[in-house]
């Protein structure tokens, strides 16, 4: 019996749509998610929530848009305008008294927001959440991998439109008290606050790769259409690989690194920022190599720099990496961008013996905008 080439291609496409593609590099190397579990295909928001939150190992395939807006009604509450009252300025929800305690002089206002966006969908251990082509979208609500969850893969989905006008209106991806998590080929856009946040509890081993963090928005804390709240990595014992991501159109916190985070930022592409990319707090450590910074006003916020930073500044200095990472660190590249030149070496020993992502020359990162995000597997 002869099998047509079309049939073989169709079978391959189906297999690709129902299983994780590739494997995590870096700190989350070895993560398996739902493994070989029989794929399930939720059709309603309730089914999606149920599959993600149960105790079974699962491969969950999204074949449509799951729009959570309106599913939990709206909330009208007190808010404030700490960044101005122009039409492009984000407003702030008075969550946990934030306006009262931190912005008492800001103009007060009343806000009506979509309740579903405030708290993401809980994702438990041993899950693979994957999208089919470009069809898998979660709109109006993020995801939360928290409370001891382990061995989770999120790949090839989009998370969008979470109360974009209102700070404290919800985050796209939240990790807190987890281990072995891989976030890959995800697109995030029009988010209230953080596109991805690692909370103050230990998130341990995490790889964030090939994602498109899209900061274009009608509303921002800087009132200029550039989202400020990008990536916030603040765990107490975190090792994070940030690899091959397209980080576009942010005015700050892309990423903010704090807690006791060890971050390996490799072969990413930052493009178009009116503010800063890295913000590095005391106790955290960042190694950046093989990245491209194009039209980035400040690759690092120097006024607040209190942690460790190795920027792979020149070929001679970069040789020190080989003893700890197994390779000589790669130079970064800059176009119409600010200064990024620091060589703290003492923390590099923390990479020794760990799963460290490979690093290509910065020329490889030039292709990142075409390969990052949903539908680019």
UniProtKB/Swiss-Prot annotation:
What are the UniProt keywords, alphabetically? Carbohydrate metabolism, Cell wall biogenesis/degradation, Disulfide bond, Glycoprotein, Lyase, Polysaccharide degradation, Secreted, Signal
Q: Please list the residues that make up the active site.
A: 253
Q: What does this protein do?
A: Pectinolytic enzymes consist of four classes of enzymes: pectin lyase, polygalacturonase, pectin methylesterase and rhamnogalacturonase. Among pectinolytic enzymes, pectin lyase is the most important in depolymerization of pectin, since it cleaves internal glycosidic bonds of highly methylated pectins.
Which protein are we looking at? Probable pectin lyase D
- Alphabetized Pfam families for the sequence: Pectate_lyase_4
Q: Which GO terms describe its molecular function?
A: pectate lyase activity; pectin lyase activity
Where does this one sit in the cell? Secreted
Catalysed reaction(s) here are: Eliminative cleavage of (1->4)-alpha-D-galacturonan methyl ester to give oligosaccharides with 4-deoxy-6-O-methyl-alpha-D-galact-4-enuronosyl groups at their non-reducing ends
Which interval of the chain is the signal sequence? 1-17
Biological processes, Gene Ontology terms: cell wall organization; pectin catabolic process
Keyword Disulfide bond annotated: yes
Establish whether keyword Manganese is in the entry: no
Family as reported in the entry's similarity comment: Belongs to the polysaccharide lyase 1 family.
Q: What class of enzyme is it?
A: lyase
State the disulfide connectivity. 80-99, 89-223, 321-329
Q: What GO cellular component entries does it have?
A: extracellular region
Q: Which SUPFAM superfamilies match?
A: Pectin lyase-like
Glycosylation sites noted in the Swiss-Prot or TrEMBL record: 126
- What's its EC? 4.2.2.10
